[in-house]
From Swiss-Prot:
Pathway: One-carbon metabolism; tetrahydrofolate interconversion. The lineage of its organism: Bacteria, Pseudomonadati, Thermodesulfobacteriota, Desulfovibrionia, Desulfovibrionales. Catalyzes the oxidation of 5,10-methylenetetrahydrofolate to 5,10-methenyltetrahydrofolate and then the hydrolysis of 5,10-methenyltetrahydrofolate to 10-formyltetrahydrofolate. This is Bifunctional protein FolD. One of its GO terms (cellular component) is cytosol.
Amino acid sequence: MLIIDGKKTAQDIRAELATEVTAATAEGRRAPGLAVILVGEDPASQVYVRNKEKACTEVGITSFAYRLPAETGQQELLDLIAECNARPDVDGILLQLPLPRGLDAQACLLAIDPAKDVDGFHPENVGRLSLGLPGFVSCTPAGVMELLRRYNLPTRGKKAVVVGRSDIVGKPLALLLTRSGEFGDATVTICHSRTPDLAEECRKADFLFLAVGRPRLITGDMVRQGAVVIDVGINRSDDGLCGDADYESVSKKAAAITPVPGGVGPMTIAMLLVNTVQSWRQRTA
């Protein structure tokens, strides 16, 4: 059984990006820049932002941190986004979600320049994904696809089941899996809370993608022998972090599986860095 190591893969990606950025700055080009906007003092968001800033430093990306109080008004936040849109040294803008109550997250995401939307949340980038056009892809599904490529797990002609239909993971992942190519061309089923027989659908999957946020929802008896299981879920339980899969029983059936932690999670930040460097390449070419 193959354990798909997202932590090691993310380290490899950061090293590759660092080599590129170091070479470019040695030639006199400016470093990539990422604006990180955090509103309020949500503890989890603060941890996420620190991790992203640390990863930026490791790669050579300049991180512009904006930490705003929870009382920040909508217009003040929109003005800051407009300022970041206009800054030539900012290649990507990351608005840490969730926002405090009273702020319209959708309006703020709409205000971000799609060319700097390295989170891939802007409707223009979502539309580009659905049409198969170039654009920024949401970091978690992009990380999943990168793991499939780097571990040479092609989905062409396979049956893929995505459990979860969120706008951030489930839906974009399903779109990526249906794109033409060796790591696409899958026949995709999306399951959710209203799916009549989830176990039956999961057992049909050659590739099973879990992104529902329910600890150990999927057990070994729900998985086909030899399936590839990609567990996007990160849940807190009495005995620590766990995924949407019951790892102990599912790993006995799977041909390959991502652990939690150490699977998809590290890839999300890695792909944020990839998107930022991609924007920088385009803007400094």
